[in-house]
Amino acid sequence: MEKIELVQKMKCDHEGEEYLIEVFARPDGSHFARTIFSPSDVIISDGISLDEVLLKHQDLLPLAIHSRQMHFPSRTLN
């Protein structure tokens, strides 16, 4: 199993709500960031460097939050 290391934790405020971002390093030097909305709802961003993965994740997080707040009308079958 690949050994990963938690290298940074930060909270991101979006529209008055705080979201935890955890950043991990892999043995090969690459990184990934993770935000857990629920046990079955997680977003992950991959990157080569810590800076790259943080930029990607901070761009993705508002979109992920917004998509979870959208209400889709139920579809009916005719």
Residue ranges and their predicted role:
Residues 1-2, 40-78:
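Mixed-charge, Lys/Arg-enriched low-complexity segments
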Residues 1-27:
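Short N-terminal "domain-start" leader segments
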Residues 9-13, 33-34, 51:
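Homeobox/homeodomain signature
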Residues 19-44:
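A short, structured beta-strand/loop element
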